[in-house]
Each structure stands twice: as C-alpha cells, then as structure tokens.
Amino acid sequence: MKDPYIAHLRKSDGQIQSVQAHLKETAALAKVFAQKLNLESAGELLGLMHDFGKYSRKFQKYIHDETGLFNPDLDDEESTPDGSKVDHSTAGAQWVYRELRKFGAAQGIGEFLGQMLGLCIASHHGEGLIDCLDGEGNPKWVERFNKTDELTHLAECERNADEVVQQKAKELAGEKLIRSLLNAVKPILSDQAT
C-alpha cells in the first residue's frame, strides 16, 4: 500500500490523519452543522473540498518538512525557505466554482452560487471572508479564483485525490445542491429587489 497523503500529524502521539480521512470527517461534521440551515449538501461539499489542495506534492513536501517525517520520493522538491504556508484551499474553491457555474449558466445562477461556496472554502483559515471587492468596487475575489494551476495545483490534486472523495464531491455538486442553495438565498434576493 502506498503512503497516504497526510493532512495532519498529531503532536501528542505522532498519529497521522490522511487527507481522505480529514476531508470525510470534516464533511460529516459540516453536514450536521449545515442541517440547521437546510443546507446539508452544501456543508458536506464544503467540508469535503476545503483542504483539497493537500493532495498536491508541494503540500506533502511542506507537511513532511514541518513534521520531520521523511519521504525520499519528495526529496527533490524544494521546501518553502521563508517558512511560508502552502496554499491548500484555493484548489477546492476553484473546483467548486468550476463545477457549480455549469448550472444555469445563462442566468449566472451557478456562477453566483459557486462564488458563494468557493469563498467559504478560500476563507476557511482567515478571520472571516476574504476581501470580495476592492475600494473601487472591483471583484477582488476573482484574483483568488483565477490563480494559476502552477500555484494551486488543482490538476495535480484531481489526479492524486482518493476516488471516494472525488466521487462524493461530484455527486454533491449537482442540481439538488443548486436548488437548496437557491431556496436559501431567494428571500435575500427578493428583499434586495424591493
């Protein structure tokens, strides 16, 4: 069996949590929390994709370096010399945005809902949502969502991700999710129109 992609290493006992286990466990919790809003599928998808970038070789090199684990297959990768973190949330944000924008493309429905969920993923390590607009009202979130694959490693993560994670994400990112999100935002949009 190949070594699992590592999400976390518990300092107290050295126990490794695989990316697959981390994403599935977070998805299960997020689904329960989102139940209060009748947005279980949205919560589950957010949990499943929030750390999708941890499937990248760059993140795996980073976590091995940070934890002192040794993996000779990663030895040719450079570590981050300045101690900076590796972006591991944008890949999931881009994936969700790309998949949801396919729905209701003519009306921009999927685009809008993909932005909403993508922003949640891209912002999950901050102290709130990332800036969505600059001082002039220009869409600043576009910079994050348009980051190159060289920086987000989305294509690599899609190749590396466990099949069970990818299948569940594809299953969740469908019309049922779009309908539930629309039902949730309709009252807000109706209030804006009046």
Regions found by a protein language model. Give the residues of each.
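Accessory nucleic-acid engagement/destabilization modules that flank
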Residues: 2-194
